[in-house]
């Protein structure tokens, strides 16, 4: 029960919750705290009204996800302390907030994402990973699928001939398969190249993208998205 229901007197009005409201999203980051996700308890008001009273307890996103879906994006960016708190909730159905042991109705579907190659991330413990079934999602298998993604996600402000879109996507995919690169461009690179080449055309007063627009956009779009392997950086630097 939530604090309102627990301390209510008499009948409580019911409210239907839509599917969208049952989907709770949490964005992982190093500064995310246990209080952000689990909730916070005001110690002074807790002494007066009780730790789970409406006055003392501020529910976090995990509490709001009960009987719904908790989607945690970039879980491995969350600090270790928060990961341990989540583990306690998933395993025991309760959590420690401050100096209080709180019973949580942890009845939700927990979905999380992570990019194992990213920097500035925390290692997920084997115990926490054991709570998940893991699905590895790679890049689009074929060029046609990637082109559809670029068209669906990219903003359109000028006409892009089909052959130029094919060139952009093919170029990005060729870099992705380059054995000399340690860091390769994602699908976002294709979307950025698609949008940047259009911007170049519009600034030049044209309504259709040319191959020159694509070429001029390549460096600003691709340069920071690729990186040579360390051994090759050393050799090429000599």
For each predicted feature, which ranges?
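Conserved ASCE/P-loop NTPase catalytic core
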Residues: 1-121, 132-135
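Short hinge/gating elements
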Residues: 23, 114-117, 135-137, 147-157, ...
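Conserved AAA+ ATPase core "coupling" helix
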Residues: 33-39, 106-107, 121-161, 165-170
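Non-catalytic, well-ordered alpha-helical scaffold segments
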Residues: 35, 60, 84, 130, ...
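Conserved catalytic core of Hanks-type protein kinase domains
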Residues: 89, 193, 220
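Conserved AAA+ ATPase small/helical "lid" subdomain
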Residues: 154-201, 205-208
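C-terminal engagement/docking regions of AAA+ P-loop ATPases
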Residues: 202-238
